[in-house]
Amino acid sequence: MAENRRMAAARVLKGITQRKLAELVGTREIEISRIETGRVTPAARLKQSIADVLEKPTFELFDN
């Protein structure tokens, strides 16, 4: 699995911590970390929730 550097970069640019993003999308901080490091691939619904919070289309944030 590829790292999701674009997701992490977008999160940092918005000034949102992993913890805050997790709260906003209804998951745990460790899950956000695992997504950003490529250890897990988020489900389509979670991808969309993250994209909505970061105000980016999913294809700009995720490799898959």
Predicted regions and their residues:
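Key DNA-contacting residues within the recognition helix of helix-turn-helix
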Residues: A8, S33-R34, F62
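A short, Lys/Arg-rich alpha-helix, primarily the initiator
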Residues: M1-L13
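Short alpha-helical DNA-recognition segment
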Residues: G15-R34
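DNA major-groove recognition helix of helix-turn-helix/homeodomain DNA-binding modules
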Residues: R45-E60
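Alpha-helical residues within the helix-turn-helix
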Residues: V12, E23, D52
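Short, conserved catalytic or interaction motifs in soluble domains
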Residues: T37
